[in-house]
UniProtKB/Swiss-Prot annotation:
Any GO CC annotation of this UniProt entry: cytoplasm
Protein name in the entry: Dual-specificity RNA methyltransferase RlmN
Cofactor: [4Fe-4S] cluster
Species whose genome carries this gene: Hyphomonas neptunium (strain ATCC 15444)
Disulphides: 124-360
GO biological process, one term: tRNA methylation
Residues involved in S-adenosyl-L-methionine binding: 186-187, 218, 240-242, 317
Task performed by this protein: Specifically methylates position 2 of adenine 2503 in 23S rRNA and position 2 of adenine 37 in tRNAs. m2A2503 modification seems to play a crucial role in the proofreading step occurring at the peptidyl transferase center and thus would serve to optimize ribosomal fidelity.
Reactions accelerated catalytically: adenosine(2503) in 23S rRNA + 2 reduced [2Fe-2S]-[ferredoxin] + 2 S-adenosyl-L-methionine = 2-methyladenosine(2503) in 23S rRNA + 5'-deoxyadenosine + L-methionine + 2 oxidized [2Fe-2S]-[ferredoxin] + S-adenosyl-L-homocysteine; adenosine(37) in tRNA + 2 reduced [2Fe-2S]-[ferredoxin] + 2 S-adenosyl-L-methionine = 2-methyladenosine(37) in tRNA + 5'-deoxyadenosine + L-methionine + 2 oxidized [2Fe-2S]-[ferredoxin] + S-adenosyl-L-homocysteine
C-alpha cells in the first residue's frame, strides 16, 4: 500500500530574506562580506554557518552558539535557514521515498531515497527541472526543460532526505543515506558548474561528509564534458548507454546523433583516475524486442573492451503512455550471463518505488517553462495573498 505523507513546509524563502541552506562555503563567505565583514572574518563565519547547517542540520540561527549574539540577530534579520517547500512526499511499500520539492512558483523537482543500495542507501538527486534530451524510454524526457537547479537546490535535496531519515549530525554511525547518485531529472553535464559546486558541498568533511567515491554522476553522453567532470569533482562516472550501435542509440538517446558511440568511448577512456578501483558504470535498460538479444550482449562486451567497468541491467519501468515493454526476466538473465562469462559484473537492478513512479526513468514533475515576467507576477500575487 502506498502511503502519502503531508510534510509541506513554507514556500520559498521568507519575503526579503535569502535562504542560506545548501550554499557552499565560498557562497556563504560572499554573503558575509556583503554584511560588511572583513574577508578573514567572513571566511571564518561562513565555515561556522556551513557546519551548523550541513553537519548539524540546524534551522535556527539562535542555535549557532559559537557565533556572537549580535551577529546571529543580524543574520536572522537578513537570512533564513529553513528548507524549501515539500509539495509531496510519498513512501513506497518497499521503503523507497520520493519528494517533490517546490523551489519557487512553477519550479518543482523530484528526488528519491532508495534503501539497500551501496553501503546502506542512496539518494537519487535531480540536476534540472525537466530535460532537453528526449530519451524515448524516460518519463522525464517528456517534460521540457524548465531550468537548471542551483548548487544550493541540489544540496537541499540531500538535506530534506536527511531530515526524513533523522540523520543529523553527519557524524552519526550506521547512516542509512551513504551514497548520492545524479540520476534524477535532467542531464548533469549540462549543468556542470552547479553540479560540481554541489558535490564540493556534499563531500565537505566538516559538513555532510559523503565521500566523492560515494557520489556517482550519470550522463547520457555529453562527451566533451566527461573528462572535465572527473577533473572537477572526482566523482564516479555512469553512462546511460542502452544500445551498442549508433542506429539504435540515435533512436533511444537522441544525443547520440551529436556525440556518437566512438566519440563517447574516447571521452570515457580520458576520464581521470579510471581503473579497477574506479570503474565506469554502464546503465542498460532492457527493452523487450528492442535491445535485449544475446548478439547485443556480445556486442556490449566488445564495446567495453579495455574500459574498467560494470554494467547495471535495468528492467524497464513503465510510465503512463510509455511505448516500450520490459524484457522477459529469462531474457534479462541470459543477457547478464553473457556479460558475466566475459568477466564483467552485471547486476540486474531490482525495481524500487514503481508504485509511486519513483523507479529509474519514471521521474517527472508538472513544472512547465514559464516566462520570467509571468513568474514575477505569480510571486507578487502569492506574496500579496500572504500579507
Amino acid at each position: 500500500m502506498t502511503v502519502t505523507l503531508n510534510l509541506s513546509r513554507p514556500n520559498s524563502a521568507l519575503p526579503g530574506k535569502k535562504r542560506l541552506t545548501g550554499l557552499s562555503v565560498p557562497a556563504l563567505k560572499a554573503e558575509m562580506e556583503a554584511l560588511g565583514l572583513e574577508p578573514k572574518a567572513a571566511n571564518m563565519r561562513a565555515r561556522q554557518i556551513r557546519r551548523w547547517i550541513h553537519h548539524f542540520g540546524t534551522t535556527d540561527f539562535a542555535a549557532m552558539t559559537d557565533i556572537a549574539k549580535d551577529l546571529r540577530a543580524q543574520l536572522a534579520e537578513k537570512f533564513e535557514v529553513e528548507r524549501p517547500e515539500i509539495a509531496d512526499h510519498q513512501v513506497s511499500r518497499d521503503g523507497t521515498q520520493k519528494w517533490l520539492t517546490r523551489y519557487g512558483p512553477g519550479i518543482e523537482g523530484e528526488s528519491v531515497y532508495i534503501p539497500d543500495v551501496g553501503k546502506a542507501g542512496a539518494l537519487c538527486v535531480s540536476s534540472q527541472v525537466g530535460c532537453t534530451l528526449n530519451c524515448t524510454f524516460c518519463h522525464t524526457g517528456t517534460q521540457a526543460l524548465v531550468r537548471n537547479l542551483t548548487a544550493a537546490e541540489i544540496v537541499q535535496q540531500v538535506i530534506i532526505a536527511r531530515d526524513a531519515l533523522s540523520e543529523w549530525p553527519s557524524s552519526i554511525e550506521e547512516r542509512r543515506l551513504t551514497n548520492i547518485v545524479f540520476m534524477g531529472m535532467g542531464e548533469p553535464l549540462y549543468n556542470l558548474d552547479n553540479v560540481a559546486e554541489a558535490i564540493d558541498t556534499i563531500s565537505d568533511g566538516d559538513g555532510m561528509a559523503i565521500g566523492r567515491r560515494r557520489i556517482t554522476v550519470s550522463t547520457a553522453g555529453v562527451a566533451p564534458k566527461i573528462p572535465e567532470l572527473g577533473e572537477r569533482t572526482g566523482a564516479m562516472l555512469a553512462i546511460s548507454l542502452h544500445a551498442t550501435n549508433n542506429d539504435l542509440r540515435n533512436e533511444l538517446v537522441p544525443l547520440n546523433r551529436k556525440y556518437d558511440i566512438q566519440t563517447l568511448f574516447d571521452a570515457i577512456r580520458a576520464y581521470p583516475g579510471l581503473g579497477n578501483a574506479k570503474r565506469v558504470t554502464f546503465e542498460y535498460v532492457m527493452l523487450k524486442g528492442i535491445n535485449d538479444t544475446l548478439a547485443e550482449a556480445r556486442d556490449l562486451v566488445k564495446l567495453m573492451k579495455g574500459v574498467p567497468s560494470k554494467i547495471n541491467l535495468i528492467p524497464f519501468n513503465p510510465w503512463p503512455g510509455s511505448p516500450y515493454e520490459c524484457s522477459d526476466w529469462e531474457t534479462i538473465e541470459e543477457f547478464a550471463e553473457v556479460l558475466n562469462r566475459a568477466g564483467y559484473a552485471s547486476p540486474i537492478r531490482t525495481p524500487r518505488g514503481r508504485d509511486i513512479l519513483a523507479a529509474c526513468g519514471q521521474l517527472r514533475s508538472e513544472s512547465v517553462k514559464v516566462r520570467a515576467s509571468e513568474l514575477r507576477k505569480q510571486q507578487a500575487s502569492a506574496e500579496g495573498a500572504e500579507s
